[in-house]
Amino acid sequence: MRKFEMSTKASTMRATVIKLHLFVAAFFAPILLMVALSGGLYLIGSKGTTERVALAVPETIVFDEGATDLKAEVSDLLRQLGQPTDFEYLKTSGKTLITRPTSRTGFEITRNEAGLSVTEVRPDWIKTIVELHKGHGPTLFKNFQKVMAVGLLFIVISGLWLGLTAKGLRQNTLLTSAAGAIIFLLLALS
């Protein structure tokens, strides 16, 4: 009787893990497909493009790139130019300030010998998903990506566990996992 109880508990746990595995995989399928698509496109050289539009900046506009609250200074500049100010944060690249996220239309602000230049940068759909993949999207999306990473770990670990604990799948699971690990190591270390 005790063996039957253990078997029933084990099969109930297995059924629960299978359901969780399937639900988590289904829930994260859209973002995992986006990551696979954007990563694949990026690796074959299709990184997307941006349309860049130089904005007219009147000489009367004052902009202090040394301001204590640079985000407020950039927001004020964009407001004076009649542009949206809904960026989340700034990235500095050399002498250029870049509004983030870069997964949507943003701006680059540069001071050079000719004065202040502001460029509107509009990504196409490929550039948008590549930027999301790289973690350059909105903060809420980046937090979702962190949760998705945990979900992906669960999907892989639960899939391995399900394969290793099923007598009929154990050998194939071990062989396939070993082959994947060997190929990964050979390619990564080559």
Language-model-derived ranges and their functions:
Residues 27-35, 82-90, 113-119:
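Short, mixed-charge, low-aromatic patches
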Residues 17-24, 77-80, 112:
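A broad, low-specificity signal for short, low-complexity segments enriched in glycine/proline
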Residues 12, 73-76, 124, 128:
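Exposed alpha-helical structural elements
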Residues 35, 39-91:
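Membrane-proximal low-complexity regions enriched in glycine and acidic/polar residues
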Residues 85-109:
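Exposed beta-strand-loop-beta-strand "reactive/processing" segments of non-cytosolic proteins
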Residues 102-149:
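Extended, hydrophilic extramembrane loops/domains of integral membrane proteins
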Residues 2-49, 140-190:
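Internal alpha-helical transmembrane segments
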